[in-house]
A protein has these predicted regions:
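Acidic, glycine-rich two-metal-ion catalytic cores of nucleic acid-processing enzymes
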Residues: 201-308
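N-terminal leader/targeting and assembly helices and adjacent pre-domain segments
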Residues: 1-203, 298-340
């Protein structure tokens, strides 16, 4: 095996190691993020419980003080989340360049990145992540601001609604009892919802339930950490003198057909299925909340069959299964495609 072949094989092995490290980083980061939000929800519940009166209810007169305490805790949550995100981004970018270094491959070669060059690529990828403007016009800082606003609004609204409705329900119940009438079940439910226990439950659901700020934070965390890794890796491997491009890989956890199936199989440049010659043509990442990767393809890996198999996007679509086309195009467009 030639020296070049040994280096290329080492880069391939190191790429797999980096992907495994990224899988671990993703799992550990999301677990820690979930714990941050769950602990915050528990702390909020304790503060609400402390504000409950002798009857266990939070009085209307205490509402503003409770909200001030809640907002303080949410700000602390935001700071902890941002620190976790920044740490994840830095590690992901480092994992991205590691397969292109002597430290990552265990071999010496002028074709690999120096430590200084690897650090520069990592830093550039981090700047890219922060400056990147998505199709919806938002940058990372905008998404973080939206996360904070969502948490503040959902938690505040849950508390305000419970306290205000509970206050009115208590007054109405007193009037009914004074007239010797029974309290309707609906009114009793509103009174119970205004108890410190009821409010704590509502707050926990608002902060950590389905579609909650925690869910959105986990989505953001995975998306941006994966982006930092991929951008660093692509920039690093395309600097290798023998790189032909990068291959778009389907995630092992790919749940159902979508646009990724097309990107991973189309041979648009005669380099082989899913191989793209540069960053501009590579469609990775195909969508948010994905844990997916690309891998380097070297020039000597390109076969005559790859070159002869160059195809158009329409030809690539035609090769997909009907189910895959539905995932890529949507049901109606896929049906229209079938009729052509």
């Amino acid at each position: 095996m030639s020296d070049d072949a040994k280096v290329q094989a080492a880069v391939k092995r190191a790429t797999l190691h980096a992907q495994r490290a990224m899988n671990k980083l993703d799992a550990e980061t999301l677990k820690e993020l979930q714990q941050l939000y769950q602990q915050a929800a528990a702390d909020l519940g304790q503060r609400i419980a402390a504000a409950g009166g002798g009857d266990g209810n939070v009085a209307l007169t205490q509402l503003q003080d409770v909200l001030a305490q809640i907002n303080d805790r949410l700000r602390a949550l935001s700071a902890a989340r941002d620190a976790l995100l920044n740490n994840g981004l830095e590690n992901a970018a480092r994992f991205g360049t590691l397969p292109l270094t002597t430290a990552g491959t265990g071999v010496q070669s002028k074709a690999l990145l120096s430590s200084a060059a690897a650090m520069r690529v990592s830093e550039e990828s981090l700047r890219f992540v922060h400056a990147f403007v998505a199709a919806d016009g938002l940058q990372l800082s905008d998404r973080i601001w939206r996360l904070d606003r969502h948490a503040r609004d959902t938690v505040t609204n849950a508390i305000e609604m419970a306290v205000i409705q509970g206050h009115g329900a208590v007054q109405a119940a007193r009037e009914l009892l004074m007239r010797g009438q029974s309290v309707p079940g609906e009114l009793a439910d509103k009174m119970n919802a205004a108890s410190s226990a009821g409010i704590s439950k509502a707050v926990s659901g608002a902060l950590t339930g389905s579609g909650s700020p925690m869910d959105n934070a986990m989505r953001l965390m995975r998306t941006e950490i994966n982006r930092a890794h991929g951008e660093a890796y692509i920039a690093g491997v395309l600097d290798h003198p023998h790189a032909a491009g990068v291959r778009f890989l389907l995630s092992p956890a790919h749940p159902e057909p979508d646009i990724c199936d097309l990107h991973a199989t189309a041979n648009l440049y005669g380099l082989g299925p899913g191989v793209y010659p540069d960053r501009e043509t590579c469609p990775w990442p195909a969508h948010p909340n994905t844990l997916s990767y690309v891998e380097v393809v070297f020039k000597d890996e390109i076969t005559d069959a790859d070159r002869a198999g160059k195809e158009t996007p329409l030809e690539a679509l035609a090769r997909l299964t009907p189910e895959q086309r539905k995932g890529v195009l949507g049901v109606k467009k896929a049906e229209a495609f079938e009729k052509k």
